[in-house]
């Protein structure tokens, strides 16, 4: 499922509020971005471990490639509880966006890691649909693509601000198309959604990375606020990664 990319959007005009030397700015920026990526990687690790743990507890055996569910797995995936798993990440995003301003950095980080655990639980059903080998393969493909795109967004001198409105419109479009396809179950529409989803989140990865860089350079904050914003940045890039991964898995993953 595609989510609104971040609870915050930010822009930048001229540098204000930062009086340090260029060396201090560069060191601060590196520390800020390192915090963003570290939090994001920990979040991905939590999601992966939760998804794997729930899958192991839910599958008793495989009949060919078809999973035989345990009673726990039947409760988790075949009862109304499956809707809780599906919708819980959206609830976390809503709460996170409403309370972010009032949270401390440590509370925001805890909330993000809790969200990552819930997201892992929500995605655990993917291991029932796709083979484990293809999930791992697509994960590494996504990691390579994400790393390259994020690096480009960080280093490019070209402003990517013009992409923002286009990408947001595309994101809204694939969300609406996905909702429509719940009723039509069209494989052709799903293929188109997946292709567009990969392209949109590839663009958002570069766009959001550049925006995070600009937010630090022009925002004039440090200390607690910088730590809090690094968590917000981790959430933004985490969602870019997760959505790109899921769309790629839909395109090239091996189904059971």
Predicted regions located by residue number:
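A hydrophobic alpha-helical transmembrane-helix feature that marks the membrane cores
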Residues: 2-256
